[in-house]
């Protein structure tokens, strides 16, 4: 048996008849399956034991030989070999066909491969194969052409006239004869000559034929093998037959299809032996052809063969296709043992890296470990008695279980797993009950809540797997989100509210202005009711143990509140004392104004100052990010746990609740609405007089009501008490926002109707006042559309992620530096005057391609190939530099992946990316995961043409599939000046005057111009509003412009929705879309014109001929959508498991393709370790070394040591 981790590539090809016979263990001659009385397989039937092996281990059919000792003996009575029953999963049989039949994949696929080889149309082929026409196989000395079709009548006429000087025949035999006669070399040379002159359709056809013929010539497949003489029969265990209760049998559809083939084949043999009339034989041959077609691909031609209840039978092709097919069901997704699932509940007392596992579940999952330990401790004599003990749940089992699960991480996964944080490792602790306990801070990453969600548990078994789980996957390690490098474990809801309440300040609170010698005294005073958490007090600065205070500050008093003293205790010692929610306080030190001299009048000073704002969710996030930046993972996870505990404790103490009395209705509301209504009446008057159009009236009414709502919202927010519980919830970022509050207390505002158009009648009531029946009805549209949208969006977003993963799955960091001399020039991304993504955001974590100097002083800010950190990026942005040349995945020279320098920092760890990181998958997940947050709808604001641009998820799909966008912009193909804008009939024309020529562009009706007369314009820039078609842009400009455009557009969509994604993820995806070139002229290379080639293959082919001083080939870059790009990948396994399985496999078989197993999917399919991360060769030769207790003190010590 081949060791799965040791072979280099996998090859697919056409099977010759001899090859099929060599696989086979015997011929299947009868259609019988199982004898229904003895339940034994029939001899020579589809389940025959002599051919396929015994049904029971080490036992022949007749029972003469039983037991292992006869291993390998072939029984002299029944002829069955004594061996394991499992060989019935691998031994094949065959059927010798009485007449050749064509293989439907090669005859019916698009384009028809047989048709291309023979230069016949698929129609003609069909007529010959299904016995409707004769084809001339040898013309002899008659005026007939070879391959000419003849009807029955014509054939008879020619037979009478010329006798047997020519040969014509029907069916697959005739095609086989033609295929055998073909001389590949001659045909190829002939086509190459023809290509030099051919144009138009003849050229395309010639290129297609050349491709197929070259494929046959290079692969060693013979075209005649597309016609089958021998049909392989797959092993019986792969098409099982099982007895149901009640004596009936359930069988795989394949058995029915094979039975039909065998029946017809046997009938044909009998007819041939009897010498039956040709018309009967022909009919039988046609039926045999159809039976084989149905077996290989049922329903591809004509009506599918149906089983009971008119259900089409599943043929061999259907076994591979689709979500339920072999590829996606069994090869890419397998069920695993040592797993369980249960409902999750919150575990607020867990540490960051812990989870609670129900006792019963843990016992079942860790059974083998517990049994071994029971035997090891002498509590059981052997494994069997240990198993019995566990089944009877002896008390000592629990103690052993406790010791077994210590330090043994488990993986928790919640479906849908949208990104890598959907599976994380935890240390289990045993809990009573039957629910899994989950740490509240990891909920964001899993997108989990406790309303009945379920999660799955998996146990990593081997010590390597455990080490990987602990080092790479522990929840405490996964603090940053891979998509943007921001902390993903920020406190939410109650935790935010508690910390917000804790850091509030209140004027005139009890005990204001008291002075304490240290924090403990202040907390004691609070516990005894002398001061409140919100009271502003003074504490001796020297008692607050903080490294950032200067000596002078330590001699003064620090003005703060009791709550903030408590809050600051959770932060690391060398962190600034945080007294106000500002970045300067967070990153540098506590502002000096909070320190006052001892002996000053504290009460007066405090009374004269404004209240300082409390800490909202955003500030807490910034604190976490800053702690992570300075102290790395261990300290951060400890601090997070402390922050969580504080939050829960003080939100409980605060007792913040919501009642109807908290919602105060605005007094001036009626006035504002009256004013708005008067304006609306005025607009309607103008419309009736014909002064404005229907569109303008609609737009104005909408904007009047929107403004009215905004005014009400503004006034509400001003009139709100800062202590109002609802305000506190929304201000802290725990739940809700200003707009929710406006709907409760102000007015609901405008609603959209089911088609998405805004209804111009606003809902004037608020929820506090109550809605009228009509208002309630209108507002139900929106709610229902929301639900329907969400359901559709989830499916769409999931499919987008699947396509993204597929196209980028083989992008892995392969080397340290590719040594490229190209880079990408980047600046801030702007839309009009609004900055969508700042230069700072785009620079952090990238390597500089060229040295960056200060524009005024000329001082060097960044040197070439230096990593740009946050601090450097700030300096660069402040210095006024507009653009920086950086290393980018776009310009990386690495084959099948990227290098460390071009990729930059790994956002998930905040450190340099490691060789072996699967950055393609990370990129796909980072773009796909927020997909569900994007909107579905195209906004209709009264149907103005320019406004109906696609946004949200549909726009992302449009970009990545490289489709022609809706509302496409007209672009200029030359550099020049706008010379004229003319009105022609009902539309406009724009004339661009270049240096050499002028170009005229017709502007489609309803499009809005973006240019003015006399304005200079460069090629590839828009003349009208709208989205550019990237394929057009590629024709007019170069790859770089298209890459930048696509990157900019994707970022625009996500940032508009408030989702941040690192540029590098989009770069990886766009790079995969631009991998291929189309050869326009082959020069003296051996590539074929018109074919799609990988850029690297193309440069290799050219390098070969240039060394000999010959003519190189030329090619144009091609932009492929992600679906097309996935199907064009070099790996046929990856493409076949994605979509269009049969087409991909047909093509691969003819070309005799080799799959070099470079990507992840191919290796998952054949069961190898994936070539990423620790599965890479450079990490495979690694041993685990036991470390002594001394160096175990460092948490998460390096476990890997090179051999």
Curated annotation (Swiss-Prot):
Q: Which InterPro entries match?
A: DNA-dir_RpoC_beta_prime, DNA-dir_RpoC_beta_prime_bact, RNA_pol_asu, RNA_pol_N, RNA_pol_Rpb1_1, RNA_pol_Rpb1_3, RNA_pol_Rpb1_3_sf, RNA_pol_Rpb1_4
**What does the note under cofactor report?**
Binds 1 Mg(2+) ion per subunit. Binds 2 Zn(2+) ions per subunit.
Binding residues for Mg(2+) = 449, 451, 453
A Pfam family recorded for this sequence: RNA_pol_Rpb1_1
- Which metal ions or organic cofactors does this protein require, according to UniProt? Mg(2+); Zn(2+)
A GO molecular function held by the record = DNA-directed RNA polymerase activity
Keywords in alphabetical order: DNA-directed RNA polymerase, Magnesium, Metal-binding, Nucleotidyltransferase, Transcription, Transferase, Zinc
Kindly state which reaction or reactions the protein catalyses.
RNA(n) + a ribonucleoside 5'-triphosphate = RNA(n+1) + diphosphate
Looking at the record's lineage, which domain of life comes first?
Bacteria
Q: Where does Zn(2+) 1 bind?
A: 60, 62, 75, 78
What are its E.C. numbers?
2.7.7.6
- Subunit annotation: The RNAP catalytic core consists of 2 alpha, 1 beta, 1 beta' and 1 omega subunit. When a sigma factor is associated with the core the holoenzyme is formed, which can initiate transcription.
What is the name attached to this protein's record?
Answer: DNA-directed RNA polymerase subunit beta'
Q: Which organism is it from?
A: Bacillus mycoides (strain KBAB4) (Bacillus weihenstephanensis)
Name of the coding gene:
rpoC
